């Protein structure tokens, strides 16, 4: 699995979202690298890990990342948040958890109302096999929908998407399955590490209310909503997100 290591200081592992790669965090890298050693992961089937055949399953991927990185705060955006949360719940080397536009459960349920309908991910999976590039384009548009900086964020995501080659279709299907089926809520009350939950006020994929609900289930948690932010608030609101991350990491024992 490809992992870029940039900067010096306390270690921070960054995990990207569906269909993208570690390069998507460029605005955060610019602001955080002077202060931290950043470990930017390309998940299997994505970016420079496109040919990595490791199944996109939480235990396998987390174990491989943990073996290649030092004790660190783990940050997960969107799909990457599931891997980061699983790591925080199972590995002592995870010092803290930062979730950006990610919750333990991405789909709506009778006891989890602030999420999207399951059919959204099922539909993307069906369309992916028929129209690969068109489906990716529609997902990127959903990532930025509602954001105060939607146009510039969409342009950035489009440029990033194929900068390291196209993601593997099999990995994309596995990722959609994770988003559709994973429910890690039971792990939250037992989280021994501090956590930070950063939501976008206008996020159409992961409503801010869902992130605040997840934080409320977690001990040692704090939640922050980025005004005007969409599903990728670290793009259009990089200063605010990076400042929140620096305050959080500084508070982690």
Curated annotation (Swiss-Prot):
- Which EC numbers characterise this protein's activity in its record? 3.1.1.85
UniProt GO cellular component terms: cytoplasm; membrane
Q: Where does substrate bind?
A: 18, 78-79, 139-143, 231
UniProt entry tagged with the keyword Hydrolase: yes
Q: What EC class does the entry list?
A: hydrolase
The record's subcellular locations are:
Cytoplasm
List the catalytic activities from the record. 6-carboxyhexanoyl-[ACP] methyl ester + H2O = 6-carboxyhexanoyl-[ACP] + methanol + H(+)
**InterPro entries xrefs:** AB_hydrolase_1, AB_hydrolase_fold, AB_hydrolase_sf, BioH
Q: Which UniProt keywords apply?
A: Biotin biosynthesis, Cytoplasm, Hydrolase, Serine esterase
Which GO molecular function terms does the record list? Answer: pimelyl-[acyl-carrier protein] methyl ester esterase activity
Q: Which residues form the active site?
A: 78, 203, 231
GO terms in the biological process aspect are: biotin biosynthetic process
Its annotated pathway reads: Cofactor biosynthesis; biotin biosynthesis
Could you tell me what this protein is called?
Pimeloyl-[acyl-carrier protein] methyl ester esterase
Source species, please? Xanthomonas oryzae pv. oryzae (strain KACC10331 / KXO85)
């Amino acid at each position: 699995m490809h992992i870029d290591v940039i900067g010096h200081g306390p270690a921070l592992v960054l995990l990207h979202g569906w269909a993208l790669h570690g390069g998507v965090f460029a605005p955060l890298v610019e602001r955080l690298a002077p202060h931290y050693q950043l470990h930017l992961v390309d998940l299997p089937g994505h970016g420079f890990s496109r040919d990595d055949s490791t199944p996109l399953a939480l235990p396998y991927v987390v174990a491989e990342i943990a073996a290649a990185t030092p004790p660190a705060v783990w940050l997960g955006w969107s799909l990457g948040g599931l891997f980061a949360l699983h790591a925080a719940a199972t590995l002592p080397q995870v010092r803290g958890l930062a979730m950006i536009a990610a919750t333990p459960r991405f789909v709506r349920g009778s006891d989890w109302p602030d999420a999207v309908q399951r059919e959204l991910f099922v539909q993307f999976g069906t369309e992916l096999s028929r129209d690969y590039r068109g489906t990716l384009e529609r997902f990127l548009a959903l990532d930025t929908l509602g954001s105060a900086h939607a146009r510039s964020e969409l342009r950035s995501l489009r440029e990033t998407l194929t900068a390291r080659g196209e993601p593997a279709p099999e990995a994309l299907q596995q990722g959609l399955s994770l988003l559709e089926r994973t429910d890690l809520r039971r792990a939250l009350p037992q989280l021994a590490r501090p956590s930070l939950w950063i939501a976008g006020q206008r996020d159409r994929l992961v409503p801010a209310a869902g992130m605040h609900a997840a934080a409320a289930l977690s001990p040692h948690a704090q939640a922050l909503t980025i005004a005007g932010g969409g599903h990728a608030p670290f793009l259009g609101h990089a200063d605010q997100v990076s400042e929140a991350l620096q305050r959080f990491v500084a508070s982690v024992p």
